[in-house]
């Protein structure tokens, strides 16, 4: 605009009122007549300087129009009747043509697009006209930035501000490119010179064209920034749902993040230093945590009304079958983007083509494939020189992992190099180069994948080989796969049976299938003839943990999944394994300075109190070149197993090998010991010598000693050699046979120590003929074989010393954890002493295994019946039913029951979330707000959001005790009624329940209660609803008669008294020892936790205990039992069941 024209009044509009505006070159903030700001809330205060002095004034954020163009700016109140405009709020009034550093060849890009487009000639000419019409939309200069006309984003930090970071050393070659970017952004107001307490380092990244991209390392800032709830959809999900029609277009928004303004209060967080001067961003910077989500949300919202459009960050995709429609919708997109203030780069855009590149893939009408650009990158890959280059190559390959069936196996050896790397160095071999080329060749020849059709069921074909699982996904009518999935089994999974490996693969396949199913059923085809029969797999054949089996079996109950047998699938087992052995080739024994042959043996111990007696044998020999024995040892080990003897023998040999200069070979005939030492020992050493259950290894001290020897002397080789072979079977047969003989000799050596009888004072007095209390005089007492015996009518019995009696009881009881009488009979076969029954009862009451396993012989008191609320809407009971079979996208039903009347409301939801609960309750609370809401302790009801919602409305939240549905009996009974009624109405069509919810709600609310003799509708409204079998007399009553009848009905409701307690019931008291029931005990696991103390009695049926984890918990006594022998039971964990100890430690 001519500067003289700025002196003229400008037409403006505020809140629908037209008035005049004046451009003021000296104004730093726009002034609006104060009458327009009376209803606005100030966002801050600022100091305003005028010719009359300085004054603090409120600042508002207002939207208004100048010359028909929308302006959003910070404003202050003015006593005048016109607007005073600040030049910074309307820069377009004096806008000059943009002049930046590098001009892009726009005409060349437009010609390329017109030449490549598949549009007919008529639409091609229309496209050419659009290029001219929307010239302001295209990027004319590199680093050109749009200006999104929205309220500026405010970057909020957490409790602590980020720490300023030092600038990295910058490559001198990058400085010219970065300086151009900074100069261009300063001209457009994207950057502003400003000092800040924060600093983020600049990290230039080279581009393929030789220039450098300006990137800032905002990791320190991002640590303090709360992540926004709305995040971008995964690219795989977008590719599965985009519309693939004949004509396709992709548009690239240039520098989209930099188009979004941020508030001045956020500038300081974005600061960086360049050439000794600090700059701050006035727009969303790249690298900021929430930039992609904020930008994408805005772009999606802008284009939501345009059909067949998909947005992913700065990439826009649209497709149509009709060329005329495609051009029409394309112009609509151009118009929206121009009005919004974005800039489009035609360099990367493709318009009206049959095949386009989107999210790194070639998008065709049938599916997607790898682009030529990606394949060229693969061909240019060279062997890596360090760990960083290897990780970069694997990242590139991983992008296309779903295009070949055995990708994970092919790259397994390359991933192993990362684990074995030493710092940044890797051991790259010629075999690795061949394997890398094999992967690249497979990807370059990979076929296109089919698109996922949302109206068809998803088909999964699953199979496995000994080392990996294979999965293919199809549309039900499709011939090409949607994608491949390959899973290499872990070290633990390699030990599974083939059935368990197949179930592991199926589990991995179904996790991915839940995203691909898009609400449709999933058909799983596998070599398993009957999935129901695998539940009967015997426990000895199960090598996986029980928790895995529980997870696998849950899929059988999922109504969305159907399992089928496909006899053609076993052919997949013939896919060759990609396996590289890590065991070095064997050397001849003459190449070692010493050879140790080891063996361990165990026999049944001659001592009846012990089970085994072990020994080990070691032979030290040398081949020089003839076999010569240097030394040999036969060592008894006492009460140990043969496995422990094998490990001890190898440990002994390793310690002796430390004194031998040069390489040493240790031979063992135990495959377990050799495999563990060569393959498992490095992992055990790294994880602290614990197994998969996080328990210490058996014989941990021996393994630690072996690991220490191998670290001190790495040239010790431990090798397995099969034992008990004929002479001359192998070069080590003679040494193995001698070691076995020495081990057997050691196992036959028994150390026998003669013990004197240990008699206490009581038995000593008895043998001296004195009368001792509890010992009948008529029997004869004597000493024989060091033991005191008594002749009784049932035979001769041993009287053990008092110190041994507890051990005898525990030994007899622990054999099978028998009850009182069975244990007493077992002991009475050999022993007798006074009060033997009393001692047995006392010791059994202290057995932790029985305490946490046996059922309670006490019953809890009678159920407390809570008082019925005095009037409707006083108390609501709420709960979720589900998951149900999917019906119109819904899986759950929120059930709300009025406590006084039993009136029920049903709300379908997609998930049992807090937001769904609040949304449903908001509808109901528009009628009346309850005083109390009772629920279980589900996540949807215990979140802080739900608590805040209830607090705002004065609602008290009440929760039932865990694992005690009786506390929410009213809603639980309604749940069972709803499920039963839905099942009856939906026979043969379980996915149609959504349409029947109103019918179910009407039926429940008009069903008579056998106890109360009224329906919930009558209790709430006083009359029948207009339904069949309704009492027609009540429908014609006046309102006064309705209220009178309703009062009579409610007054007639009586509160049934609490039933009397049974003779076996118990009542809790403070300080009492009780045991809590395990919520969902697995097979062969304890049913009760260890004893806990009652801290507080809330009511006769609810207490607060100090649970087994040390936390205070509210529990119903239905889930408790009193501990036997309150005074004689300790609460320490020394004798606690080892299973529970493991659970606590994990």
Swiss-Prot record:
Keywords: Aspartyl protease, DNA integration, DNA recombination, DNA-directed DNA polymerase, Endonuclease, Host cytoplasm, Host nucleus, Hydrolase, Magnesium, Metal-binding, Multifunctional enzyme, Nuclease, Nucleotidyltransferase, Protease, RNA-binding, RNA-directed DNA polymerase, Transferase, Viral genome integration, Viral penetration into host nucleus, Virion, Virus entry into host cell. The record marks 596-597, 751-752 as: Cleavage. Residues 1114-1146 are annotated as: Disordered. Residues 198-363 form the Reverse transcriptase domain. Residues 1114-1134 have a biased composition (Polar residues). Specific enzymatic cleavages in vivo by viral protease yield mature proteins. The protease is not cleaved off from Pol. Since cleavage efficiency is not optimal for all sites, long and active p65Pro-RT, p87Pro-RT-RNaseH and even some Pr125Pol are detected in infected cells. Binds 2 magnesium ions for reverse transcriptase polymerase activity. Binds 2 magnesium ions for ribonuclease H (RNase H) activity. Substrate-binding is a precondition for magnesium binding. The active site is at residue 24. Its EC number is 2.7.7.49, 2.7.7.7, 3.1.26.4, 3.4.23.-. The protease is a homodimer, whose active site consists of two apposed aspartic acid residues. This is Pro-Pol polyprotein. The lineage of its organism: Viruses, Riboviria, Pararnavirae, Artverviricota, Revtraviricetes.
């Amino acid at each position: 605009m001519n500067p003289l024209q700025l002196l003229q009044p400008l037409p403006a509009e505020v809140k629908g009122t037209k008035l005049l505006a004046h451009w003021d070159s000296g104004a730093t903030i726009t002034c609006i007549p104060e009458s327009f700001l009376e209803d606005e809330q100030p966002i801050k205060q600022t100091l305003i300087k005028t010719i009359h002095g300085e004054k603090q004034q409120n600042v508002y954020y207002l939207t208004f129009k100048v010359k028909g163009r929308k302006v959003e700016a910070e404003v202050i109140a003015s006593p005048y009747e016109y607007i005073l405009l600040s030049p910074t709020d309307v820069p377009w009034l004096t806008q000059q043509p943009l002049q930046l550093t590098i001009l892009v060849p726009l005409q060349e890009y437009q010609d390329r697009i017109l030449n490549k487009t598949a549009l007919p000639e008529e639409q091609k000419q229309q496209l050419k006209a659009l290029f001219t019409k929307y010239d302001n939309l295209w990027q004319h200069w590199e680093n050109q930035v749009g200006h999104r006309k929205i309220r500026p984003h405010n970057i909020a930090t957490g409790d602590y501000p980020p720490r300023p970071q030092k600038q990295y050393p910058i490559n001198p070659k990058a400085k010219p490119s970065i300086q151009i970017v900074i100069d261009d952004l300063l001209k457009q107001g994207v950057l502003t010179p400003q000092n800040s307490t924060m600093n983020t380092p600049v990290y230039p990244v080279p581009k393929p064209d030789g220039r450098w991209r300006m990137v800032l390392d905002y990791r320190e800032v991002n640590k303090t920034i709360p992540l926004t709830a709305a995040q971008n959809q995964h690219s795989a999900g977008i590719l599965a749902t985009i519309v693939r029609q004949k004509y396709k277009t992709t548009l690239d928004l240039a520098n989209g993040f930099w188009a979004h303004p941020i508030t001045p209060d956020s500038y300081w967080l974005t600061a960086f230093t360049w050439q000794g001067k600090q700059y701050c961003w006035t727009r969303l910077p790249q690298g900021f945590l929430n930039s992609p989500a904020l930008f994408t949300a805005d772009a999606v919202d802008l284009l939501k009304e345009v059909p067949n459009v998909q947005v992913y960050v700065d990439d826009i995709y649209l497709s149509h079958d009709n060329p005329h429609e495609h051009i029409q919708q394309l112009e609509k997109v151009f118009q929206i983007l121009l009005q919004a203030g974005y800039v489009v780069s035609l360099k990367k855009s493709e318009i009206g083509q049959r095949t386009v590149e989107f999210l790194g893939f070639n998008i065709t009408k049938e599916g997607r494939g790898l682009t030529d650009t990606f394949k060229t990158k693969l061909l240019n890959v060279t062997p890596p020189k360090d760990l960083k280059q290897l990780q970069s190559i694997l990242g590139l390959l991983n992008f296309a992992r779903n295009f070949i069936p055995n990708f994970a196996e092919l790259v397994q050896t390359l991933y192993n190099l990362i684990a074995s790397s030493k710092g940044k160095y890797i051991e790259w071999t010629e075999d690795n180069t061949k394997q890398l080329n094999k992967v690249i060749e497979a990807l370059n020849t990979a076929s296109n994948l089919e698109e996922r059709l949302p109206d068809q069921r998803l088909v999964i074909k699953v199979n496995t080989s000994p080392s990996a699982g294979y999965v293919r996904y199809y549309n039900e009518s499709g011939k090409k796969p949607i994608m491949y999935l390959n899973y290499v089994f872990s070290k633990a999974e390699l030990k599974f049976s083939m059935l368990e490996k197949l179930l592991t693969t199926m589990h991995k396949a179904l996790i991915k299938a839940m995203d691909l199913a898009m609400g449709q059923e999933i058909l799983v085809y596998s070599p398993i003839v009957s999935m129901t029969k695998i539940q009967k797999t015997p426990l000895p054949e199960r090598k996986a943990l029980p928790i895995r089996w529980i997870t696998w079996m849950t899929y059988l109950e999922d109504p969305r999944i159907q399992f089928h047998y496909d006899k053609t699938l076993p052919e997949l087992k013939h896919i060759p394994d990609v396996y590289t052995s890590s065991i070095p080739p064997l050397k001849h024994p003459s190449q070692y300075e010493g050879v140790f042959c080891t063996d361990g043996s165990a026999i049944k111990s001659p001592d009846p109190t012990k089970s085994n007696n072990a020994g080990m044998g070691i032979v030290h020999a040398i081949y020089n070149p003839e076999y010569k024995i240097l030394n040999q040892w036969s060592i008894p080990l006492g009460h140990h197993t043969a496995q422990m003897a094998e490990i001890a023998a190898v440990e002994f040999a390793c310690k002796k090998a430390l004194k031998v200069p040069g390489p040493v070979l240790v031979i063992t005939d135990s495959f377990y010991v050799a495999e563990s030492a060569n393959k498992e020992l490095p992992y055990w050493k790294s994880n602290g010598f614990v197994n998969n259950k996080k328990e210490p290894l058996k014989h941990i001290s021996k393994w630690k000693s072996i690991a220490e020897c191998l670290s001190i002397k790495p040239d010790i080789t431990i090798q397995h050699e099969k034992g008990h072979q004929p002479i001359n079977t192998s070069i080590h047969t003679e040494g193995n046979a001698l070691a076995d003989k020495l081990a057997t000799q050691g196992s036959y050596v028994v150390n026998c120590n003669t013990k004197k009888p240990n008699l206490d004072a009581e038995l000593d007095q008895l043998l001296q003929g004195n009368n001792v209390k509890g010992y009948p005089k008529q029997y004869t007492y004597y000493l024989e074989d060091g033991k005191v015996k008594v002749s009784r009518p049932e035979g001769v019995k041993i009287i053990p010393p008092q110190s041994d009696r507890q051990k005898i009881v525990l030994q007899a009881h622990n054999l099978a954890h028998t009850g009182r009488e069975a244990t007493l009979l077992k002991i009475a076969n050999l022993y007798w002493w006074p009060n033997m029954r009393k001692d047995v009862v006392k010791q059994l009451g202290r057995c932790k295994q029985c305490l946490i396993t046996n059922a309670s012989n006490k019953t809890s008191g009678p159920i407390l019946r809570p008082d019925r609320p005095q009037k409707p809407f006083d108390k609501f009971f709420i709960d979720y039913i589900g998951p149900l079979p999917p019906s119109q996208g819904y899986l759950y039903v929120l059930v709300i029951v009025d406590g006084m009347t039993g009136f029920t409301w049903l709300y379908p939801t997609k998930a049992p979330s807090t937001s769904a609960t609040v949304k449903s309750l908001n509808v109901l609370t528009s009628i009346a707000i309850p005083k109390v809401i009772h629920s279980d302790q589900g996540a949807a009801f215990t979140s802080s959001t739900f608590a805040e919602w209830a607090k705002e409305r004065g609602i008290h939240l009440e929760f039932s005790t865990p694992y005690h549905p009786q506390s929410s009996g009213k809603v639980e009974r309604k749940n069972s009624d709803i499920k039963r009624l839905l099942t009856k109405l939906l026979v043969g069509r379980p996915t149609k329940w959504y349409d029947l919810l109103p019918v179910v709600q009407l039926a429940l609310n008009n069903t008579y209660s056998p106890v109360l003799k009224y329906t919930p509708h009558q209790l709430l409204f006083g009359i029948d609803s207009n339904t069949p079998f309704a009492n027609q007399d009540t429908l014609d009553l006046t309102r006064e008669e309705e209220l009178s009848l309703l009062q009579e009905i409610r007054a007639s409701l009586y509160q049934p008294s609490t039933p009397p307690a049974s003779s076996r019931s118990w009542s809790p008291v403070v300080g009492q020892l009780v045991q809590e029931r395990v919520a969902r005990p697995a097979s062969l696991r304890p049913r009760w936790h260890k004893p806990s103390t009652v801290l507080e009695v809330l009511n006769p049926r609810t207490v607060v205990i100090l649970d087994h984890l040390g936390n205070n918990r509210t529990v119903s006594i239905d889930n408790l039992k009193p501990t036997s022998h309150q005074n004689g039971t300790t609460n320490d964990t020394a004798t606690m069941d080892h299973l529970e100890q493991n659970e606590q430690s994990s």
